[in-house]
Swiss-Prot record:
This is UPF0246 protein BURPS668_1321. Belongs to the UPF0246 family. It comes from Burkholderia pseudomallei (strain 668). GO terms for cellular component: cytosol. One of its GO terms (biological process) is response to hydroperoxide. The lineage of its organism: Bacteria, Pseudomonadati, Pseudomonadota, Betaproteobacteria, Burkholderiales. Pfam families: H2O2_YaaD (PF03883).
Amino acid sequence: MIIVLSPAKSLDYETPPHVSHHTQPQFADDAAALIDELRRLSPQQIGTLMSISDPLARLNFQRYADWSRASTPANAKQAVLAFNGDVYEGLDARSLSPDDLDYAQRHVRVLSGLYGLLRPLDLLQPYRLEMGTRFSNARGKDLYAFWGERITHALNAELKTRVGASRVLVNCASAEYFKSVKPKLLDARVVTPVFEDWKDGRYKIISFHAKRARGLMARYVVEGRIDSPDALKDFASEGYAFDASASNDDTYVFRRRAGA
């Protein structure tokens, strides 16, 4: 079983990693090709492309200039420890043991606009490039065209090593990022957990809580060494509970009445 997550825009390069083990991104050459094209943009063009402020545009202009094809602990950090958004607060990888991180390395993947597909311990250099960015490039009109079927083929290569009920992709990524995967080409069942909170008289998806819950689900999978979709139904972190009546074979709905 493999669980896929979205990345985060917020990054932490201040906190030293608590593990030294690291790996190299599979699609580093593709990332370098994108960086070469991004370096042609001015800060103003970056700001317009990404709809970000002038200071953020200048920051990312400098990040692209500083980016190196060679990722080392001196210029990069393990992805799961560098990402710092809501999903990663739920995952809280900094508190995972080395054994937990080793399991995550085999079962967790992060979709990325720049890197395509990352393992938790792949070295990540600072960047910002959301998958939905309409960045025209040598391969097409946007990043979905750039990545094409590459991410899907990479996931299939890993899923083929899993047997039986464990040949499952758990989609804990956003719609923007999961669009880079071609489910019809996947040699696996896809299960999507959905997290809803009670508000204004009904259950609804609240973005902040849903993002955090995706990270909590990934942590549950890692700590529990979960390798079958049925075991996902026992997830009960921070008040969530599986609701069979709202779920089906492909979508597992978890609900809670009050905030954690």
